[in-house]
């Protein structure tokens, strides 16, 4: 979603702020909204409708294969597996599910001890139902642990099913992939994130402005967990959701400043563009944050298509140089110079 240019200075709020932080009683514990509003049923999950519908078929028919769900963070991979387990096992969920985070428990000992012991346990379940072992962030497991897991999956295939969630399925060894149904999740769209945010805002009675919601969606980049965390953090800190407060909490280069910098490049005004870059640099933002936001703003910036293609090519080239650790401020200043050069009228010979 494009961040609208409101014509006001980024440091100014778009609306009058009410009284700050909502009052909370001493010792009151606020459950994170990510957990409070975590879906409990498959039909409550936002986005990835085709993949979720396959899981609903598994839940109805009962005989689930081993599954791998791969996709970006915050798209509902672990939640989908938990909803599937809840639909399949019902009241037996507590006894028949083992949940492990493979980024902590990543060694071969975990497969030999925890997983093997759970797979050997006897649990009475209805026909066509199996115990479920959930391995979150399975792409963090060592190769040795994955090799050991392959044999365990074969031995206990009559009683136990494995559900793996990971960001990159190519980090799971081929023998495990061939034993599983691989489901792929994609980033959520801005509209899907907005729908869920509005649902939470209504229930929590959160005051907001449209530019505040756009700022949350801009910073989340299709990650629902990030969006809800940013919403709750802004509400807890300021009691009001507007773009100024959101960017204070998220502490990213403000897109209106970045937009202004790109506009100066389009106008071939390198001096003004560099002033904004130097300002962002002195605020302490990392080069990756600055270059990433330049790219995200450039994608929706109103300019000629051929010029946008040239800009994105130069931004990508500079990002590569910055990632290699080459003097970052110099590289970004060079980027501004090249962007200005793209828009300058050719000099008559």
Swiss-Prot record:
GO molecular function: ATP binding; ATP hydrolysis activity; DNA binding; DNA clamp loader activity; enzyme binding; single-stranded DNA helicase activity
N6-acetyllysine PTM sites in chain numbering: 158, 299
Keywords for this protein: Acetylation, ATP-binding, DNA replication, Nucleotide-binding, Nucleus
Record InterPro entries: AAA+_ATPase, ATPase_AAA_core, DNA_pol3_clamp-load_cplx_C, DNA_Rep/Repair_Clamp_Loader, P-loop_NTPase, Rep_factorC_C, RFC_lid
Modified residues (N-acetylmethionine): 1
Known partners and oligomeric status: Subunit of the RFC complex, an heteropentameric complex consisting of a large subunit RFC1 and four small subunits RFC2, RFC3, RFC4 and RFC5; the RFC complex interacts with PCNA. Forms an heterotetrameric complex with RFC3, RFC4 and RFC5; this complex has ATPase activity but is not stimulated by PCNA. The heterotetramer of subunits RFC2, RFC3, RFC4 and RFC5 interacts with RAD17. RFC2 also interacts with PRKAR1A; the complex may be involved in cell survival. Interacts with DDX11.
PANTHER family hit by this protein: REPLICATION FACTOR C / DNA POLYMERASE III GAMMA-TAU SUBUNIT, REPLICATION FACTOR C SUBUNIT 2
Purpose: Subunit of the replication factor C (RFC) complex which acts during elongation of primed DNA templates by DNA polymerases delta and epsilon, and is necessary for ATP-dependent loading of proliferating cell nuclear antigen (PCNA) onto primed DNA. This subunit binds ATP.
Name this polypeptide is given: Replication factor C subunit 2
Species assigned in the record: Mus musculus (Mouse)
Taxonomic lineage: Eukaryota, Metazoa, Chordata, Craniata, Vertebrata
Underlying gene: Rfc2
